[in-house]
């Protein structure tokens, strides 16, 4: 059985490909059911011209027929802490566990999971910090290789600044 680091490493590779190929935010998601990959999603906000084409939503939408009937556990590996929208989608799809690399200090949704206990029948286990440094370095690389003309640049710059401040 592969561990969380294995799947997160795959997600980070996918995020780097999306960044290089499409100038997208370096955020991606891999959906795993009982240690078998059932989907991959990359953030596509630049390509889609919007702000809700998140990797988590993309992979859950693509695998929608499988998520309710697949073997368990169903684990969502994402390179950045999910926002509240993506957390809600994961809960509604019955994800058992969410694993993320880097915290999204300005808008991360993991803190809302505990607030939802008692409201929703099933809340996924949430594990953060898996290969956190690798994702942080990828975010820094995005800032260095892109500029303010990329709409995602400001968000990534804020993520990195707040992350660095949290380390002090």
What are these regions (language model features)?
Residues 83-86:
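Short cysteine clusters
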Residues 38-45:
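Short beta->alpha transition motifs characteristic of CBS
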Residues 1-18, 89-168:
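Zinc-dependent deaminase
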Residues 69-80:
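Immediate flanking context of iron-sulfur cluster ligation sites
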Residues 26-35:
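Short beta-strand scaffold segments in enzyme catalytic cores
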Residues 47-58:
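A short, polar/charged loop-to-alpha-helix boundary motif
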Residues 19-23:
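Short loop/turn motifs at secondary-structure junctions and domain boundaries
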């Amino acid at each position: 059985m592969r561990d969380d680091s294995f799947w997160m490493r795959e997600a980070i590779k996918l995020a780097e490909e999306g960044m290089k190929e499409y100038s997208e935010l370096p955020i991606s998601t891999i959906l795993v059911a009982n240690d078998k990959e059932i989907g991959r999603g990359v953030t596509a906000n630049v390509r889609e011209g919007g702000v809700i084409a998140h990797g988590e939503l993309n992979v859950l939408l693509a695998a929608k027929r499988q998520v309710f009937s697949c073997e368990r556990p169903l684990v969502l590996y994402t390179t950045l802490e999910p926002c509240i929208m993506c957390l809600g989608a994961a809960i509604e799809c019955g994800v058992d566990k969410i694993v993320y690399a880097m915290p999204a200090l300005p808008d991360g949704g993991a803190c809302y999971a505990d607030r939802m206990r008692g409201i929703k029948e099933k809340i996924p286990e949430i594990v953060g910090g898996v290969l956190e440094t690798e994702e942080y370095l990828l975010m820094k690389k995005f800032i260095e290789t892109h500029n303010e003309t990329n709409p995602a640049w400001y968000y990534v710059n804020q993520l990195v600044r707040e992350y660095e401040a949290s380390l002090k």
